[in-house]
């Protein structure tokens, strides 16, 4: 009986050990990043939007990544014991459902199983997100001092959780309608018909889902980073600078979410602003201006977070790498993306033809679509989130941490300039080198976590909040 009790205790400690669960998710992500190029239909560099196969591959990595962020945020903020246990014990079920869904995605004979497994995984994730949200709401009442210290970061994490949750529900509604239509839901079906019909509604819905989810996730990462840096230790002036940036990001998240909501569930068409050229083709899409506000808020927070850079070289390099991912993302999205939007009479929104129905440089627009999805919407969020894990959990292994940051800094700079070259020449070679360096960094990070987690002083099971 004692032996059985000891065995159960070991399994309990294993399943509730955040570091072990982080290792599992990182290993899962690393494996799929490595085998991705050989999966059927997965083509990293193909002009235009992601194919269905590429979208499936993208979600295979990014959904576990979002789970990883929930796990980390729950531990970082010291949310309720029940919530943290629920998240930790969900690690392997989420990974297993994702794996099986990916395997069953390819054969036509198993697509129904794929739909069921991925739907189960998505509902599970939504339940975890709701638990996370509820416990976030409780935090100011459970620990008023912590809330006062990090109110700006807390507000951004809370709002981005809501925004990402709405985007997730949009994705689920889209999948249901895409598979079955809405005839079985008369009230919704009547609205869909009034909003322009099934295909119009589905198009608006999937656009809102994809355009809202990643800015919300990146905004959440900024909030988590502020807490991870320990910005509450700053002087009041510098702390207020960080809080100002976080509030700017909150405003951008709310306005972005509102725009995508009314453009999905209604007839509102998101306009462009500051238009010019034939048919008003040149101009900044209003939704892009709002997602840009989130990024601007992130850049403002850097001004204050700079003063928290560590004197330890390895720690400092990790912190600099984190901030660099934000800067690189904004450089691509604003520096390249905005410039193209104000010259759509040439780029043609990625459509061949002449203005206002297309443009001679449409292929370069398609190159940007592919390049920025891979860099700014894929590898940069991955790096930004995973770096926070290193910052929080890995305090030793200075050699490995320095090596990791060298790969990240090089990959981020080369990858960012690679997007620009892709847009200018249609050559994706430089960007591919940058992305390869970032993937190597993730593999080394996974190895370092394995090494750290297996040490005797590794993190034990989930502990009560202080």
Question: What are these regions, as identified by a protein language model?
Answer:
Residues 2-4, 454-466:
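Short, charged juxtamembrane terminal tails flanking transmembrane helices
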Residues 2-28, 150-155, 316-327:
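Cytosolic juxtamembrane helix and N-cap/initiation of the first transmembrane helix
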Residues 6-9, 36-42, 64-76, 148-151, ...:
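Hydrophobic alpha-helical transmembrane segments
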Residues 11-15, 78-87, 141-152, 231-238, ...:
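Membrane-interface helix-boundary motifs at transmembrane edges
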Residues 19-43, 54-78, 85-108, 120-140, ...:
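Hydrophobic cores of alpha-helical transmembrane segments in multi-pass integral membrane proteins
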Residues 38-56, 105-120, 179-204, 265-286, ...:
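Membrane-interface interhelical loops and short amphipathic "cap" helices
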Residues 113-127, 312-317:
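Cytosolic-side membrane-entry/anchor segment at the start of a transmembrane helix
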Residues 146-151, 237, 282-289, 317-318, ...:
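Interfacial loop-to-transmembrane junctions
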């Amino acid at each position: 009986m004692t032996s059985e009790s000891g065995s159960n205790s070991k399994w309990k400690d294993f399943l509730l050990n955040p570091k072990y669960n982080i290792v599992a998710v990182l290993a899962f992500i690393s494996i799929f990043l490595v085998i991705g190029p050989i999966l059927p239909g997965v083509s990293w560099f193909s002009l235009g939007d992601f194919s269905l196969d590429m979208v499936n591959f993208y979600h295979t990595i990014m959904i576990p990544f979002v789970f990883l962020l929930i796990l980390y945020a729950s531990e970082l903020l010291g949310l309720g014991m029940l919530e943290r246990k629920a998240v930790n014990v969900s690690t392997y079920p989420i990974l297993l459902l994702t794996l099986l869904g990916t395997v069953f995605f390819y054969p036509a004979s198993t697509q129904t199983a794929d739909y069921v497994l991925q739907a189960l995984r998505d509902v599970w994730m939504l339940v975890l997100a709701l638990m996370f949200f509820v416990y976030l709401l409780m935090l100011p009442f459970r620990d008023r001092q912590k809330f006062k210290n990090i109110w700006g970061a807390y507000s951004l994490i809370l709002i981005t959780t809501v925004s990402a949750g709405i985007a997730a529900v949009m994705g689920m509604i889209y999948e249901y309608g895409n598979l079955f239509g809405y005839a079985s839901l008369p009230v919704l079906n009547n609205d869909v018909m009034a909003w322009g019909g099934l295909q119009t509604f589905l198009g608006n819905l999937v656009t809102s889902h994809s355009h809202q989810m990643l800015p919300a996730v990146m905004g959440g990462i900024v909030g988590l980073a502020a807490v991870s840096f320990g910005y509450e230790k700053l002087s009041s002036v510098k702390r207020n600078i960080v809080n100002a940036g976080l509030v700017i990001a909150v405003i951008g998240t709310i306005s972005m979410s509102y725009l995508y909501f009314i453009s999905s569930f209604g007839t509102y068409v998101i306009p462009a602003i500051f238009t010019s050229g034939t048919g008003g083709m040149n101009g900044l899409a209003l939704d892009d201006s709002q997602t840009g506000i989130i990024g601007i808020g992130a850049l403002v927070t850097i001004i204050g977070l700079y003063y928290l850079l560590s004197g330890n070289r390895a720690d400092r390099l990790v912190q600099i790498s984190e901030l660099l991912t934000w800067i690189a993302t904004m450089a691509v999205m604003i520096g390249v993306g905005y410039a193209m939007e104000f010259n759509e009479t040439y780029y043609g929104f990625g459509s061949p033809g002449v203005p206002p129905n297309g443009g001679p440089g449409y292929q370069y627009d398609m190159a940007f679509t592919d390049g920025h999805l891979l860099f700014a919407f894929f590898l940069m969020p991955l790096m930004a989130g995973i770096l926070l894990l290193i910052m929080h959990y890995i305090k030793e292994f200075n050699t490995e941490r320095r090596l990791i940051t060298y790969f990240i800094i090089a990959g981020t700079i080369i990858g960012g300039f690679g997007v620009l070259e892709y847009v200018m020449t249609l050559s994706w070679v430089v960007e591919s080198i940058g992305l390869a360096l970032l993937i190597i960094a993730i593999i080394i990070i996974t190895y370092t976590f394995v090494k750290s987690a297996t040490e005797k002083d590794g993190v034990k099971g989930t502990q009560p909040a202080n």
